[in-house]
Amino acid sequence: MNDAVITLNGLEKRFPGMDKPAVAPLDCTIHAGYVTGLVGPDGAGKTTLMRMLAGLLKPDSGSATVIGFDPIKNDGALHAVLGYMPQKFGLYEDLTVMENLNLYADLRSVTGEARKQTFARLLEFTSLGPFTGRLAGKLSGGMKQKLGLACTLVGEPKVLLLDEPGVGVDPISRRELWQMVHELAGEGMLILWSTSYLDEAEQCRDVLLMNEGELLYQGEPKALTQTMAGRSFLMTSPHEGNRKLLQRALKLPQVSDGMIQGKSVRLILKKEATPDDIRHADGMPEININETTPRFEDAFIDLLGGAGTSESPLGAILHTVEGTPGETVIEAKELTKKFGDFAATDHVNFAVKRGEIFGLLGPNGAGKSTTFKMMCGLLVPTSGQALVLGMDLKESSGKARQHLGYMAQKFSLYGNLTVEQNLRFFSGVYGLRGRAQNEKISRMSEAFGLKSIASHATDELPLGFKQRLALACSLMHEPDILFLDEPTSGVDPLTRREFWLHINSMVEKGVTVMVTTHFMDEAEYCDRIGLVYRGKLIASGTPDDLKAQSANDEQPDPTMEQAFIQLIHDWDKEHSNE
């Protein structure tokens, strides 16, 4: 076993104007030979800790040693043996894959035969060999992360710090990244992987769980998960849909957390609560409730004190959408988009009914985003039709867009404007003026908890507040249809739950939602899902339908992520001769 370690002794970091330290005095030891996960919600202190370990931030008190080096006093020696991949890794998008590798090799002084051998090993390791001449900007999200990892590994570091490398990456690419990182750890490298995705944390041998700068837990994820035995349940009702059932359950004092899981509601009960407490609670309909296997996420949420929010205030301020329940409001007919001879979307067909949440899933580069952009009028189809409320977006885009709300990936907010200025700008774009505009800004600010930060520059906001603001901006004109492009990418489970409470309350009002996501637990909130691969719609149905389609002897009860990977594997096998 490699004896490389990170040791923290009372390590603390404070920033001016903050009541609490970004990282409270922290004592722990991190070993090599396996992947250690750094887990916590937005603002927990994960990135601050990473930056101190990399020597990019000076601690206010305490000390850290990284394989024997002080990150500040011995920065030169440390940087020779440390690889750090930040959230926004510095790839040069106008350079090719090989040109990026050459640049990082120059920076690391890797030359001659050593460079040649290193590149050969990394290109094989990352499967990027066939793409050395491709511009980095033209790579899919998963391939960019692999290239970022390859560039970080050019100098053959002994310590690897990865800050949320799985954000925006599809399940197949994430699995490949994990296989690569586990292989490196097995060779004796010390690896610290920061994440807000708790399914990733479950793959770590050891985790550090932080919240508000404090270390709440260090140990095996499995050990923390086992503390939740007898407290995780799946609930259904023959008389009520899962969204309404979730709203009722979250108001009960016996419930610590709840979320939609396919056709069921997943509940975490407080320590002394029993299923009978839920069955006999006031206002609950007839239910079926059965114990299920706990997950690390259940333990994480419980350790943080539960989900906290039980109801979205949006339901009280949004109007009910007029229209016939069950009528088709979004439709793709033989939808095709070609770039030269390449068909990014190839004769795709689907229909979305009023008041439904429809999810588009697919690997990076599969055509999912192209399809989504055509459906909300951001791309013109080569052939076929994208219809919204019966209107062809190619012919009636202006009229159709009056009924659409769009929340872009990475939120598309104006960072140099304040929160209120963003709300004023977007409401103005949607035609609101004067008193009506002021009232809508006030109501949305109240609903999303933005009033106290109205004068803050948007660039300075934590990710969770940016997400709230982006959703508020997209709802200023109270659209009938809402398009969400990876709306919770990189946010923590608490923020994700709050977001979906808002979405569920809107759907109860008749709003139709179309969403793209790489986060498979999020797909469970969808009524139906379309899986796009190689430009084609290869599967569609409810989350439970897709899981049933992918079930086999090895995986009789697959997760949504396992179903995603299996359905693509099955399609590849079936079309291997084409």
Swiss-Prot record:
Phenotype upon loss of function: Mutant shows increased sensitivity to cefoperazone, a third-generation cephalosporin.
ABC transporter domain segment(s): 6-237, 330-559
Any Gene Ontology CC annotation: plasma membrane
Induction: Repressed by the transcriptional regulator CecR.
Binding site for ATP 1: G40, P41, D42, G43, A44, G45, K46, T47
Ranges annotated as spanning the membrane: none
Binding residue positions for ATP 2: G362, P363, N364, G365, A366, G367, K368, S369
Alphabetical GO biological process terms: lithium ion transmembrane transport; sodium ion transmembrane transport; tetracycline transmembrane transport; xenobiotic detoxification by transmembrane export across the plasma membrane; xenobiotic transmembrane transport
Keywords: ATP-binding, Nucleotide-binding, Repeat, Transport
Gene3D superfamilies referenced in this protein's UniProt entry, alphabetically: P-loop containing nucleotide triphosphate hydrolases (3.40.50.300)
Pfam families: ABC_tran (PF00005)
Molecular function per GO: ATP binding; ATP hydrolysis activity; efflux transmembrane transporter activity
Function: Part of the ABC transporter complex YbhFSR that could be involved in efflux of cefoperazone. Probably responsible for energy coupling to the transport system.
Family: Belongs to the ABC transporter superfamily.
Oligomer status and interactors: The complex is probably composed of two ATP-binding proteins (YbhF) and two transmembrane proteins (YbhR and YbhS).
Protein name: Probable multidrug ABC transporter ATP-binding protein YbhF
Organism for this UniProt entry: Escherichia coli (strain K12)
